[in-house]
From Swiss-Prot:
Keyword Transmembrane helix attached: yes
Domain of life: Bacteria
Annotated region described as Disordered, given as residue ranges: 34-59
UniProt subunit comment: Interacts with the Sec translocase complex via SecD. Specifically interacts with transmembrane segments of nascent integral membrane proteins during membrane integration.
Similarity comment: family membership: Belongs to the OXA1/ALB3/YidC family. Type 1 subfamily.
Keywords: Cell inner membrane, Cell membrane, Chaperone, Membrane, Protein transport, Transmembrane, Transmembrane helix, Transport
GO cellular component: plasma membrane
Protein name as annotated: Membrane protein insertase YidC
Purpose: Required for the insertion and/or proper folding and/or complex formation of integral membrane proteins into the membrane. Involved in integration of membrane proteins that insert both dependently and independently of the Sec translocase complex, as well as at least some lipoproteins. Aids folding of multispanning membrane proteins.
Composition-biased stretches (Polar residues): 34-55
InterPro entries listed in its UniProt record: Membr_insert_YidC, Membr_insert_YidC_N, YidC/ALB3/OXA1/COX18, YidC/Oxa/ALB_C, YidC_ALB_C, YidC_periplasmic_sf
Length: 541
């Protein structure tokens, strides 16, 4: 087993990994929605049916004639006074495209796509139903979080049948979490029973992943019993979920690359997570238990909406397991610490590209004992080649005897035949973990390195890094002694750097940078190890 065969093994592992990711995308397709007209914010099916009897009494179904704009340092929201739904969220610190003046819009409601956050009250004294939504009034149409102000409250009010309903949206500085409070002041002569719900509504969309950048767009949720689970639009079409959220713990959300929206119930001992499909829309959300408010009293029901980038520390502080929406796959236990280390390094050096380079040196340094063992094992195997050749000549076609004597020779010479490839196999989880850590890090979105690399999350526009990476692989091959004599195998080995280069043309520049620096470290380590082996007589140029 030599370096070139290890490279072949690595190539096969990488190809298998990429094909597996693409298989996941293709075996979990989402059906694209056909939208020919402007989508309305409210339509039949938006409001769930209450568990309380007589819940679908008609309410005011007047169309909205006013939108409210709420601006903070990180968010610009548009709220429809009909229902008080958030129909648009603009992320003020994230450009829509690199160097674009327009900001990224997460929630929106237009002709091409509808993705909004709904909440309301249902039940006998509820103000929302499938026949109409509550028409709130507000004192202003524009609310701005002023400099030095840490919190802003936006009240929407409605009076009906002796009951005052106040829906208050609470935004805070440097926060993508929005608290939504329903205060029900019952000044009627009878008890009032209401039930709060909070949904995310979105068109049924195709996942949109690719071979080199598999992404997920669909639902996800967390409960006390299930820390994190994706629930795609196809899943919603197949089965409506209704899951008890023990102790009111958990969240229901919709995810996409780098960004997420999620509803979190607050201050309840029980809640229900629900999904459904109505027409061209998928819904995922939470339902709070019904509350009965005696005459002359009031009560408040609360939920929190996260609508923003997948920033793990802030998400973890907002809701338990919400940070798991940054999905590192089955190697999360490796990827998560790597991301934390990468973020720590970046906080010191101030550049994500430099942080990736330093992280590469740290990872490769930690794996140096494996690398040294790999090259030492390969050198010993090469030293045994003359004896193995003589053994084959002497034994002939008796495979059983050949295998037996080979194992005896390995034992006598203290050589592990798998010692050359095992370190490569052990390194693959590191590569895959780094792949997901870089792929899922919103911090790398539009993050520059230097020169022509202005976005580490996108491919190199001039393909310079992939070409340098391919050249470094070619140098590693040329510097590595080989026992491969079969012409076909030699051609395959020569083709491996070309194949890797082609694959990496469309990989994010940050990942290609990691691989390039890793190859440079390999060349340095290879030179040092070979010099040490030469002194021991285990390697010859």
């Amino acid at each position: 087993m030599d370096t070139q065969r290890n490279i072949l093994l690595l190539a096969l592992a990488l190809v298998s990994f990429l094909l597996f990711q693409q298989w996941q995308v293709e075996t979990n397709p989402q059906q694209p929605a056909t939208v020919s007209t402007v989508q309305q914010t409210h339509k039949n099916g938006d409001v769930p049916t209450s568990s309380t009897a007589n819940s679908d009494a008609p309410v005011d179904s007047a169309q909205s004639d006013k939108l409210i704009t709420i601006t903070t340092d990180v968010l610009t929201l548009k709220v429809d006074t009909l229902g008080g739904d958030i129909i648009e969220s603009v992320l003020n610190k994230y450009d829509a495209e690199l160097d674009s003046k327009a900001k990224f819009v997460l929630l929106k409601n237009d002709a091409d796509h509808s993705y909004i956050a709904q909440s309301g009250l249902i039940g006998p004294q509820g103000i929302d139903s499938n026949t109409g939504r509550a028409q709130f009034t507000a004192k202003k149409t524009d609310y701005v979080l002023a400099d030095g102000q840490n919190e802003l409250r936006i009240p929407l009010t409605l009076e009906k049948n002796g009951i005052t309903y106040t829906k208050t949206l609470i935004v805070k500085r440097d926060s993508y979490a929005i608290d939504v409070e329903y205060t029900v002041n019952n000044q009627s002569s009878a008890p009032a029973t209401v039930e709060m719900y909070a949904n995310l509504k979105q068109n049924l969309l195709d996942d949109g992943g690719s071979l080199t950048m598999p992404t997920y767009r669909g639902g996800a949720y967390s409960t006390e019993d299930t820390r994190y689970k994706k629930y795609s639009f196809d899943d919603m079409e197949d089965k409506n979920l209704s899951i008890d959220m023990t102790n009111g713990q958990g969240w229901a959300g919709m995810l996409q690359h780098y960004f997420a929206s999620a509803w979190i119930p607050r201050n309840v001992n029980d809640a229900t997570l629900t999904t459904r499909v109505a027409g061209d829309y998928g819904y995922i959300g939470v339902r709070m238990p019904s509350v009965t408010i005696p005459a002359g009293q009031e009560d408040t029901l609360t939920a929190t909406l996260w609508t923003g980038p997948k920033l793990q520390p802030q998400m973890a502080a907002t809701a338990k397991y919400l940070d798991l929406s940054v999905d590192y796959g089955w190697l999360w236990f490796i990827a998560s610490p790597l991301h934390k280390l990468l973020s720590f390094i970046q906080s010191i050096v101030g550049n994500w590209g430099l942080a990736i380079m330093i992280l590469t040196f740290i990872v490769r340094g930690a794996m140096y004992p494996l690398t040294k063992a790999q090259y030492t094992s390969m050198a010993k195997m090469r030293m045994l080649q003359p004896k193995l050749a003589a053994m084959r000549e002497r034994i002939g076609d008796d495979r059983q005897r050949m295998s037996q004597e080979m194992m005896e020779l390995y034992k006598k010479e203290k050589v592990n035949p798998l010692g050359g490839c095992l370190p490569i196999v052990l390194q693959m989880p590191i590569f895959i973990s780094l792949y997901w850590a870089l792929m899922e890090s919103v911090e790398l979105r539009h993050a520059p390195f230097f020169g022509w690399i202005t976005d580490l999350s996108a491919q190199d526009p001039y393909y310079i890094l992939p070409l340098l990476m391919g050249a470094s692989m070619f140098l590693i091959q040329k510097m590595s002694p080989t026992t491969v004599t079969d012409p076909m195998q030699q051609k395959i080995m020569t083709f491996i750097p070309v194949m890797f280069t082609v694959f990496f043309l469309w990989f994010p520049a940050g990942l290609v940078l990691y691989w390039l620096v890793s190859n440079v470290v390999t060349l340095i380590q290879q030179t040092l190890i070979y010099r040490a082996l030469e002194k021991k007589g285990l390697h010859s140029k």
